[in-house]
Amino acid sequence: MASPTATPPTGETIEVLPAVGRFDDFALVAGVQKPGAGGCWCMSYRDSRLNNLERPLYMADECSRDPGPGVLAYVDGEVAGWCSIAPRSSYRRLMNSRTIPFLDEGPVAAADAWVAVCFVVQPKFRHQGLMNALLEGAVEHARAHGARVVEGYPIESADPRGQGAGKVDVISGYVGTTRLFERAGFTRAAETTAHSGGRVRWLMRKLV
């Protein structure tokens, strides 16, 4: 199911689509182009034990069937970004995490929550609102596949030195920011003991 299209101030049309049947586009955004070269392939949370040759094969299989491993953003038809969104139970690292807790309260067990764990935007498409569109599309994708709650574990937007909203670098911000998730209607459920780029990460939730 496609998310509604959006037109940013620059005039381009953004569309967010499931990654099912679009492995080649996923590979352009989140993979590596040299066979066997080191790269995450968005496997860090899923199963980091797989080697460099196994990772693209795993994700190709995930992209071959519903619900798929996430969503892709397209700007005027060109693949531009990626968000990993899947049930928490599919992320081995999260199921064994000592720093990101399970929440037992609420109408849905933590293991049944869908989780948006990673965002990637191609350099030429940054600063165009793509992460907002990706998160909105990820939530819609999760809802379409029966999710009742979506979680994320973004970093604190505020500067850790107490100087307001500081600039977040691309590497630290791959998990998103609290400001991004708050704009999408998520609320802070718990502070975690996980950090990225020296900033604390929050467990944020949205009922869908």
State the predicted function of each range.
Residues 143-148, 156-191:
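Conserved active-site alpha-helix within GNAT-family acetyltransferase domains
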Residues 195-200:
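Short acidic/glycine-enriched loop/turn segments that link adjacent beta-strands
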Residues 42-70, 75:
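Active-site rim helix/loop that mediates acceptor-substrate recognition in acyltransferases
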Residues 65, 78-119, 160-174:
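Conserved acyl-donor/pantetheine-binding loop and adjacent beta-alpha core of acyl/acetyltransferases
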Residues 116-121, 127-143:
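Conserved acetyl-CoA-binding loop-helix of GNAT-fold acetyltransferases
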Residues 116, 150-152:
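Conserved hydrophobic beta-strand within the GNAT/NAT acetyltransferase core sheet
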Residues 1-47:
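Conserved N-terminal entry element of GNAT/NAT acetyltransferase domains
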Residues 26, 68-83:
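Conserved beta-hairpin
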